[in-house]
Amino acid sequence: MGNTDNLGSWEQIRRGVVEVEHLISQKQFNASMVKSLEVLDLMVRTLAEKACIIDTDLMTMIDQLYQNHWISKPTCEHYHRIRTIGTKALNEGASNAYDASQAHQLLSQEVYTFANEF
């Protein structure tokens, strides 16, 4: 059952990245940043479950994954940057090409790491 769940999560993550790319190409920068946050949230919750980390807020789970050596320091920093960009888009309506592109670039890099290591 765990394998099926992981495959389902992986497929959602993969589709989420494709959607982020599509939103950026349509110049829907706010929506792309929010979607990046959603994909990050799914990745972090998937890892947290594997690491037996209690489901709390995203920031805390990222920190706990790093402290428990599930993710590297650069990955932790990337996760927090994506989280910050996405949260700003969600709460403040931020919508700019630079942040959307940065979130997408970091997310793509970390999805690649996620796919190869987990």
Predicted features and spans:
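Amphipathic alpha-helical interaction segments
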Residues: 34-38, 42, 60, 84, ...
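Hydrophobic alpha-helical packing segments in soluble, helical-rich domains
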Residues: 30-54
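Amphipathic alpha-helix face/heptad-repeat signature
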Residues: 9, 32-36, 75-78, 103
